[in-house]
Amino acid sequence: MHSRIFQISKMWIGKENYLNEDTLHQGDGSFYDYCAEIDDEERKEDIRYFVNTALPKDMFELVGDDTMRYIGGVEQWKENFVTNIRKKAEAITTENMLEFVGPVYQLEKALENPLDIAYHFYLDGEGYQSFAEKSFAFMEFVCTLEPGTILYIGGV
């Protein structure tokens, strides 16, 4: 379960291109039925929390109601990510590899959602993508950014 899906792009996103419940598929041929419009104040509050609390500390700053700036820091984040993945992989043994919610599952979670957040990401400003992605895809996107890059938040 994820509480929000954030549409993020390097291009400004017009309201006509905001994601909505009809934009996204869950991957099993069905739509995200809980993805519904929220009012402007709730959207602003969700964006503030997302940028100031959910994303890696000191890597982003909110510069407008729907605009954030990438400050930098992805190299340190990558070092921490690799260290965490190695630690989780080393915890896997032949005895515990099949445990329910065991170390294999924990490794899988860390690979797919390294930010360990309940958000998914829609990384398309024009509305062509039909699926939301977990935080690893967002961090792959961040790895392509230069410090100072402005990112626009569309639908939430």
Predicted regions and their residues:
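Short, extreme N-terminal segment that most often corresponds to the first beta-strand
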Residues: M1-Y34, P147-V156
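Generic structural signal of hydrophobic/aromatic residues within well-ordered alpha-helices
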Residues: K15, L19-N20, D46-I47, V51, ...
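Acidic, proline/glycine-rich low-complexity IDRs
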Residues: M1, D116-V156
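Low-complexity, serine/threonine/proline-enriched polar segments
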Residues: Q26-D124
